Amino acid sequence: MHLNFGFSAVQILWTLTFAALLVLLVVLLGRDRVRRFPWFTASMALMALRMVASRLLFGKMAPIVSNEIFLALAVVAALVALLVVVEMARRAFSSASRTAWITATLVLVAVGGVVLAAWGPWPSAKTLFAGSTLGVLRLMQLIAQKAETLADLLVIQLGILVVLFGRRFHAGWRSHVQQIVIGLSTAAMAQLAVRGIWQVIALHTTIHSRADYVRVMALEEKLFNADSVVFLAALVWWIVCLWIDEPGSKAAGAPAETAPAVAEQLLPDADEEESQAEPLPSDAK
């Protein structure tokens, strides 16, 4: 017996991802995590906005206008992703010395810059700086792609540093910072792996017939669906981890702190006992 749900894998993953994003935003707001991670919250809200915009506006507007909207959102999302990396680094290594900060920043940016320079083809300057709307759109697309790739490279390196040295700077396994960085780095590794595999396939595959084209497009869909599954797992990981308070936080230590106060309320005060006690009869003269 074959069950036909009438929904494709892309539609199911889109629905589950969007629902998980909404739940994560509720957890961030309800559990008061926004104060510690404002840029991470903004990135999740922006991702939900992009998903809604792609579902509602794609194919219903002029191509130039829709491309301008989607590319503008992509550029903003890429810049926010870079700010998320900075935010997580500051939270994880806030007690590190200035020298360590400068050294680690230079090393991470240098490694990320070298990999970014070698990653993928770069368009020519004439194509980017042509005085036309199409040239502007290509420049926006390049900025969004390269900034997002740089953010992925930086967050992967940051994840390695947090896992190795986070405990020394009070960012251990059960801290929200390390849990968020683990999810970000896992999603970034999956995204870069899918991009790399698809780039190799696109460069070394020759289409001879329509069947070959359909087969390659089906492979592309499977790759991006796998990336979506990894990101969905990261969303579930964040929901569970951010719902639970960190060890030693005020919310986690509330019962232990309120116990002495309750005991003081239950035990009578010594002054009240003396005032309520009956006076002893005086000695007869």
Features from the language model and the residues they span:
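Membrane-interfacial loop-to-transmembrane alpha-helix junctions, especially the N-terminal start
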Residues: D32-S43, A100-A104, R174-L184
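Internal transmembrane alpha-helix with an interfacial aromatic "cap," most often the third helix
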Residues: L21-L29, M61-A62, L73-L108, V114-A130, ...
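C-terminal transmembrane-bundle signature of multipass membrane proteins
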Residues: L161-K285
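Hydrophobic alpha-helical transmembrane segments of multi-pass membrane proteins
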Residues: P38-L57, A77, L184-Q199
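Short aromatic-rich membrane-water interface segments that cap or initiate transmembrane helices
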Residues: H2-S8, N67-V76, G135-L150, V214-F224
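Short, hydrophobic transmembrane alpha-helix segments
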Residues: L3-N4, L24-V34, L56-M61
